[in-house]
Every structure is written in C-alpha cells, then in structure tokens.
Amino acid sequence: MARILGVGRSSASSLNNKEDNESDVALLSPKDPNRVHTKEQLAHPASSNLDPSMQGLPAGLSLDDFIPGHLRTHIGSSSRGTRVPVIRNGGSNTLNFQFHDPAPRTVCNGCPPPRRDGSLNPDPAWYQTWPGPGSRPSMSPKPPASQHAQNWSATWTKDSKRQDKRWVKYEGIGPVDESGMPIAPRSSVDSPRDWYRRMFQQIHRKMPDLQLDWTLEDPPKVVSARASSAEPRHLGTLQRPASRPGTTETSSGRNWNHSEETSRNTFNYNFRPSSSGLHPPNQVPRHREKVENVWTEDSWNQFLHELETGHKPKKPLVDDPVEKPAQPIEVLLERELAKLSAELDKDLRAIETRLPSPKNSQAPRRPLEQPGLEQQPSARLSSAWRPNSPHAPYFSSSRPLSPHRMADGGGSPFLGRRDFVYPSSAREPSASERGSSPSRKEEKKRKAARLKFDFQAQSPKELSLQKGDIVYIHKEVDKNWLEGEHHGRLGIFPANYVEVLPADEIPKPIKPPTYQVLEYGDAVAQYTFKGDLEVELSFRKGERICLIRKVNEHWYEGRITGTGRQGIFPASYVQINREPRLRLCDDGPQLPASPNPTTTAHLSSHSHPSSIPVDPTDWGGRTSPRRSAFPFPITLQEPRSQTQSLNTPGPTLSHPRATSRPINLGPSSPNTEIHWTPYRAMYQYRPQNEDELELREGDRVDVMQQCDDGWFVGVSRRTQKFGTFPGNYVAPV
C-alpha cells in the first residue's frame, strides 16, 4: 500500500471510527482475493505487512481512504456535505488535510445533511486515484469534464509522489464579513491563494505607508513604473475560468508522471488576483494604492513559496525603496557649506558695523606711518569719544584718586602713583618716536584734548603734562589710558586727566594764572587730620602750619612748619592766625619780598613748593570721605578782610624733578639754590625700582626735593646713594 505523508490527527469520536471500520469491512467483495488479507490487517494491525510509516495510524482514519475504488461500495452523495477539511499540525508546509465528521452537524445549503451510511454507494471523488502495489489502473470510461468541476480540487504533496482529492465547500474565497475579511477556513475554499491574499490585505490595510520611488516630474502620478507594468497582466486575468486546468480528470486511477505533476505544482502556480480586490488604474483607493502597487504577482508567488517551503527567500519580497538623493552627497555638502559661509559672513558684517573700525584700535605707533588714520573723518573720531560712547573715558570733575592705597596692616603705608599698573600693550616709545612729530595738518585731523590736571610721568612710556596743555590723542590703549602726542613727544597718560575738545573748537592751550606769594599765612592745628588723598595734608593737633594760599572758603593750602610736607586741608581743622597775601603776575612765580622772620629758615628750603593740581570748583564744599563720618565742632574763624585774599585758585608753582645736584631755578631766581634738609627714617623700606632708595629704621637722609605725589628725593648717609623714597617713611630731624 502506498505511503501517505502528512496525515494529521483526527478529532472524531471513537464511535464514529468504529462505524466507519465496520462499513469499510462490509464494502469488501466476497470474491476479492484481498478481502481475507484486509480483514487480517484490520484484526491484527501490529502483525500486518504495512509500511512502517503506516503503523500506528490515528484512530480517526477510515478504510475508505485505503481501499481501491473498484472494491468500494457506493456511498450516498449526501455524505459530501459532512466532510469538513481541517488543517493539522499547525498548518504544515505540505498543505495536507484531514477529513472528519464533526460532532454537531453543520448546515449545508440551508438543510442539515444526513449521516453517512456505509451501505450507500461511495462518491468516486473520495477514493484514491493512485494505484496500489500490484494493481493496474482502471479502464473505466471518463465522466464528462464538467461533471465534478465545481465539487473538487487537487492538492499535491511536497515530494510529488501522490495526489489526493478533497471536497470543496465554497467557491472563490468564500463568504466575507462586513469589512471584507474571509470567514471560511482556507482549506474549504476553491481559491486558497486568493483567500490568503484577501486575508493579508485586510489584516495589513492599516500598515504604515511604504516608501515608493515616486517620479518627481509628474506629481499626480502615484503608481510606480513597476506596478503599472504589471497592470496589463492583472487585467488580463480578471476573467477567471470556470474550472482549473486538469480538474476535469476522472477518478479512474490514471498514472501520474513526474512531468505532469511538475507542470501543475503549486510552486509554478499562476497568480490570479481576486477580482474583488482590484480597481481600475485610475481608481486606486488612497489607503490601499501603495500596498496594491508593491505586492505584485512575482512578490506574491515568492511569498507563498516561502510560506509553503519554509525556506528563506533568495531576494526580498518587496524591494526596499531606499530614497536616493536627487544629487550626489558632495554637491549637497558643498551647497550646505556655502550657505553656512554666507550666514557667517553676514554675522561678521553685522558685528563690524557695531564695533569700531580696527584701524582705530590698531593704529601704528609711529606718527609718520599712519596714512589710514589721517584719512579718517573727524566725525568718526568724535563719535568714538562722545560721553555716551561705550569707549569714552570717564571724566571726573575732581582730581582722580590714587589707584591703590596700602592697608594699615602691611606693606608700604603709602606709595602714591608708584602703584599704577601700566598696560602691557603699550611699549616704551623710542627716542625717534618721541622726537618725531606729525605735521600741523595731521594734528588738526586728530582728536585734541586739554589737560585738566598736572600729570608727572613715572616711567619712560608715560608723557608728562601740565594742566591746560593740548594733547593730540592717537589711540585708546584701554579704558583707563590713552596714547597721544604733545610737542613732538609721544607717550601714554590717564584718560580721566584730559577733556576731549569738540571738533569745532580750536585747540588752544590754557595756562593757569601765576600768583606770587607776598606773605605767607600762619595757622595752628586744633584737631588731628589725616588726609585720604595725595593732595591732602595730614597733621596732628598743635602743629603749626604755614599757609600758602586760600583755595576757597573751606580749604587752604599749606605746609607743616619745619617739614617738607605740603598739601590742602580743611579750614575748620585749624585756627587761622594770619591770611596769606598773593599777587597775580604774568612773568612767573617770584619769591615773597619780605617773608616772615620766623619762617625764613624754613622757607629757604621750600622757596618753590611743588605744584598741586587743585581746582577750586573741585574742592569747594567737599570734605574727606573718612572725615565725613567723624564728628567735630565747627570753629571756623572768619578770615580777615584783605584785598590780597582771593577765593580763586592760588599759584601753581612747579618745577621739574630734581637731579643729583642742586637745581638752579632759572632766570626768575638765579641766585637761589635748594638746600638739603635732614630727615630720619621711621620705617624700613625696601626699594621696588632701581631709582628708589633703601631705608632702614634710624637712617639719616638728606632730602633735596619733595614731589607732589608724596615721594622725596634725597641721599642716604648710610649708603651714599641717591634716589627716591616715600615721604611718609621719614620724619624731619
């Protein structure tokens, strides 16, 4: 007996199996030589000579499936409605089916079919069509081709060794629900492929849209070229034939050769899409057009091939439509880089419009090598130095404070302007730079400024200036320092020491009036005063003060009798004994004609006091910050009415810094020399520059000059060296 592959287990009851076995035994003819052998096989299945694969068959099998057709009795045609095909083994790839009689009878065509009776004639569609061992094919005539065309279909196993015929319950894909999904099992329909196709489309109809290779030239066209090329074949298969090729063969046991089986194999099955799932090319639904276009005939055949064989496909079912760029990546990168470069250039231009021109901030230091600066309009320079400009220096109405004042706890008690931190960007001008001056035309194009205070240079890079001088600004070193030129000399100076002149004003230097001290005044300190500024004079209670001039009604300028300390102080701290007498002169400062005899000895060493830049408008009505919080009684003595007493600034008597020898004061006093004044060091001082003098406590120092910044110039008797040192480190002997 031939080997049957893939026969599944049955779910029928044992009672039905027993009835089927009894009916199968009754179907055997008495004259059949195989009847006795068949009975023995049924009675002793373990000792039968069946194929080993047939031993231990499921109990749901009946002998109708194994008895040749010419030995079977007729079975009523009504049993055809009770045969329901069921897929076993989880839907194996061989697509083999097991037929059983369900327990509750199903309704077929509106009426319940009768129970199968073994005494009735069997339907020829239910017995096997392949010959058994030793048997010959039946020579019975073939029925008409259309007799069972709608009642059965063929299914082949994978090894192509045999064929089986089964009953078909539904035509096409069978009934569907309201959404279009098939209801009947796939094994009970006439077109399982169409059934599977419809089932797949209904399950995946909401799947994400697949990316297709759309043509950019024709936007309304949504069907790809590959899908449109397959449409003629789809349209040509809309008219399905009434029966499939080869289904009209009779069941008279013809021999199946391998060539015929291969031509009718499911692997070579011609894909025929269902007419219910197709639409005209111009009426493709929006939600299904991409799925229809992607799953072509070849894709479906390959997908079903993989489903039946379980093998991996050689190529993807649907080509992954990788979106290719319209242009090469190099072109896109170059375009993006050009766009970024354009944006960067735009931002840089916007920044350049908001910032000053680099020619202003990076002008050459040499005046003769500035062609770009000469060609700049004065309007731009004036706008750069407006008070509301972000680069405009801060102009104070009073003399600027010292940048640093040492704390009481350590370091030098007072170093004055020696503590200035000069900008590192300004290099020392050479002699050629200081000696070279631009032309008058160049000076007019530069911005001019007038000095508000005297400025004494402390390093070669600085420029010594006096109040009222005109200086031409070359550039701004930083927010605190400017670089400019005065009388051919180039250097830096503080920005808050100058006042920038308007463009329409002619730069003309203003010299302060010169006063001659006719008679020095006299005062006695009633309270101890400690100055907070360089120009302020500190004294103790009871010290006598020589008055030089009256700055205004609240401030006096004077010096401590017997010392070289000089400065301004509030009038409320002293008792005025005698007001100083001054005289305005145009020829320069002169010594008093008849000085006080009590102060002659002291005036000899201080005949020309250092200049202190004091503006009466700056000091009027102002007190020291530290003194403002110190309560003291106001005992201001009314000054005596004198015509020589002035409320205007006093004389500004200045002279250049002293050298190592006594300095001749010039033609105004040709016979006057500065005498040395002995001082004693009160504190130890370590020099910080080469021109400074080392002091130890108790050293004797001969002071030659007292500078306006609080520093003294003299010679140490211990080291016999000449230099400068802070004046508050020493005291007069």
Curated annotation (Swiss-Prot):
SUPFAM superfamilies: SH3-domain (SSF50044). Phosphorylated at Ser-594 by MAPK1/ERK2 during cell spreading. GO terms for molecular function: vinculin binding. GO terms for cellular component: cytoplasm; cytoskeleton; focal adhesion; nucleus. Residues 164-232 form the SoHo domain. Residues 444-579 are annotated as: Binds to vinculin. Residues 147-157, 245-256, 264-277, 638-651 have a biased composition (Polar residues). Residues 1-51, 129-165, 224-285, 352-448, 584-672 are annotated as: Disordered. It is found in: Cell junction, Focal adhesion; Cell junction; Cytoplasm, Cytoskeleton. Keywords: Cell adhesion, Cell junction, Cytoplasm, Cytoskeleton, Phosphoprotein, Repeat, SH3 domain. Residues 674-733 are annotated as: Binds to SOS. The modification Phosphoserine is found at S412, S459, S594, S607, S610, S624. Interacts with vinculin by the first two SH3 domains and the proline rich region of vinculin. Binds to SOS (guanine nucleotide exchange factor of RAS and RAC), through its third SH3 domain. The formation of this complex is down-regulated by phosphorylation of SOS. Interacts with SAFB2, INPPL1/SHIP2 and SRCIN1. Interacts with DLG5 through its third SH3 domain. Interacts with SOCS7 and MAPK1/ERK2. Interacts with FASLG. This is Vinexin. It comes from Mus musculus (Mouse).
